[in-house]
Design a protein with these regions (language model features):
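N-terminal intrinsically disordered, cationic/polar leader segments
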Residues: 2-53, 57-111
Length: 111
């Protein structure tokens, strides 16, 4: 795969992922707000004001998640995003960090 094709596939995967997360947040029972600026998605838990931030890192073709518990770097491994340090897939990681920050179970229902 050429570098341009690889970049296009990476950017498409990021866009699809962020849209899926936004849709899941819209349908979640937990009171959360989100704001997106280009490829940075900031999720704010309304009960306590804490945030989880997802950002595109094009130079290394990763998706980074910043949470209270730390920073996580995810690479796209078909069929989805995998964290290089915990081995978790993105849905599991997001549910975990959101639950930790909320102090109660959060499930976005992502696949």
């Amino acid at each position: 795969m050429t570098q341009t094709a690889s970049n296009a596939a990476y950017n498409a995967a990021i866009e699809e992922t962020l849209i899926a997360i936004e849709d899941a947040l819209d349908n979640c029972d937990v009171d959360m707000d989100y704001e997106r600026a280009d490829a940075v998605l900031t999720i704010t838990l309304e009960d306590n004001g804490t945030q989880v931030i997802l950002s595109r890192q094009s130079a290394v073709q990763e998706l980074w998640v910043a949470a209270r518990s730390g920073g996580f770097h995810l690479s796209f491994k078909n069929p989805g995003w995998k964290c290089s340090t915990t081995g978790e897939d993105l849905p599991t990681l997001l549910d975990r960090v959101l639950s930790e920050q909320q102090g109660a179970a959060v499930s976005l229902g992502l696949q």
